[in-house]
């Protein structure tokens, strides 16, 4: 998390000012991806924890070198009236990639032997997919940027005179931080809530089913909300998602069995999907064309801070659970009520934001194939 918070804004800003035959972002995408792929070898060969930690830091650094400029490509290449759908595809691709690797690795465990064991094969598949993805991206983006080099250079020179941090962006960052904190709280403490508060006999199994349901609801909601946000604007869709997430979070406090948990979890998943898709589209809409790399890097700092904040809530939950005269799961009740409040706070903070509106279509863009 620390590496991502430092590397992404720094590399993003450098990429904004880069001029090369491959364009602004591609050199960093290639560098980061290639060295991250090479670093995967070190994971398997590391003889002790110290070496493994160093290898992991190396991989994380290079992943973030590629990731920040890669995310800026949405703002670089997609007209504003299609950013909603692009954001939906981005979120679904993230989830699908993770699901595929989990499924492949799970299938390989224990199925191979000898020098080519499941670890080498899994790492090899990951490296191969990474290199294939950056090859396709690099060719597509390089060709496109070469067609419009003069436009990008003039934008970068002009926009470098202005600061990225504005009151508008500040409100958005705080809003995103609190909503990501709420989302990450469910991911972090969901199993403990099911065990200690709902009282399920097999919380791990219930959580597994719940994840599948949430993933399905989230995927549908992400796709639909991206399309809708391109039609009606980002803020209304984010607010609908935030309100839905807040109400369904409070509804979870009434769950008494696995069936109720499953139903409520699907509503939470759908609401969070709506929120995430439109919120990421709004993040891109707020970006200055010439400083998308730095802008997205800063947005991701808020994302990282929200996820990290959720991890720090554990001791507070335990302390609240032990208050005399209160239920043993009092801490979880406060956590869920607080998460609902954070969803609402995030929506309220977005209300003063001025967006470009759905009628804007960039005139400086090459039509997409």
Predicted regions: what they are:
Residues 4, 87-109, 300-311:
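Glycine-rich segments within core transmembrane alpha-helices of 12-TM secondary carriers
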Residues 30-47, 243-256:
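C-terminal ends and interior cores of transmembrane alpha-helices
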Residues 39-42, 49-66, 260-274:
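Hydrophobic core of transmembrane alpha-helices in multi-pass small-molecule transporters
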Residues 44, 129-141, 332, 337-369:
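Multi-pass alpha-helical transporter architecture, strongest
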Residues 65-78, 275-288:
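Intracellular juxtamembrane helix-capping segments at the cytosolic ends
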Residues 109-127, 317-342:
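A membrane-interface helix-boundary motif in multi-pass transporters
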Residues 143-174, 367-369:
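Juxtamembrane intracellular "pre-TM" segments in multi-pass secondary transporters
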Residues 188-205:
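Short amphipathic helix-loop junctions that connect adjacent transmembrane helices
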């Amino acid at each position: 998390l620390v590496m991502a918070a430092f590397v992404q804004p720094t590399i993003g800003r450098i990429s904004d000012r880069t001029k090369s035959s491959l364009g602004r972002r591609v050199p960093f995408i290639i560098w980061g991806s290639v060295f991250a792929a090479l670093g995967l070898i070190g994971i398997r060969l590391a003889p002790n924890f110290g070496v493994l930690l160093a290898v992991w830091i190396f991989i994380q650094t290079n992943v973030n070198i590629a990731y920040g400029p890669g995310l800026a490509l949405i703002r670089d290449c997609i007209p504003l009236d299609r950013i909603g759908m692009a954001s939906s595809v981005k979120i679904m691709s993230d989830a699908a990639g993770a699901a595929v690797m989990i499924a492949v690795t799970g299938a390989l465990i224990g199925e191979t032997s000898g020098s080519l064991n499941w670890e080498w094969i899994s790492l090899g598949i990951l490296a191969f997919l990474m290199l294939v993805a950056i090859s396709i991206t690099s060719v597509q983006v390089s060709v496109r940027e070469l067609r419009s080099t003069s436009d990008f250079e003039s934008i970068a020179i002009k926009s470098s005179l202005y600061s990225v941090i504005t009151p508008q962006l500040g409100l958005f960052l705080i809003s995103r931080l609190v909503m990501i904190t709420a989302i990450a709280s469910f991911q972090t403490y969901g199993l403990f809530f099911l065990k200690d508060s709902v009282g399920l006999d097999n919380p791990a199994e219930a959580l597994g089913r719940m994840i599948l349901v949430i993933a399905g609801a989230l995927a549908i909601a992400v796709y639909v909300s991206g399309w809708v946000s391109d039609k009606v604007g980002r803020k209304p869709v984010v607010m609908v998602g935030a309100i839905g997430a807040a109400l369904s979070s409070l509804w979870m406090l009434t769950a008494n069995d696995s069936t109720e948990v499953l139903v409520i979890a699907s509503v939470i998943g759908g609401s969070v999907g709506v929120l995430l898709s439109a919120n990421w589209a709004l993040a891109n809409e707020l970006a200055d064309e010439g400083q998308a790399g730095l802008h997205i890097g800063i947005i991701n700092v808020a994302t990282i801070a929200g996820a990290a904040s959720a991890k720090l809530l554990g001791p507070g939950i335990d302390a609240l659970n032990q208050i005399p005269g209160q239920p043993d799961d009092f801490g979880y009740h406060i956590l869920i009520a607080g998460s609902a409040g954070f969803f609402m706070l995030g929506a309220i903070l977005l209300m003063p934001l001025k967006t470009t509106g759905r009628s804007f279509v960039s005139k400086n863009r090459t039509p997409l194939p």
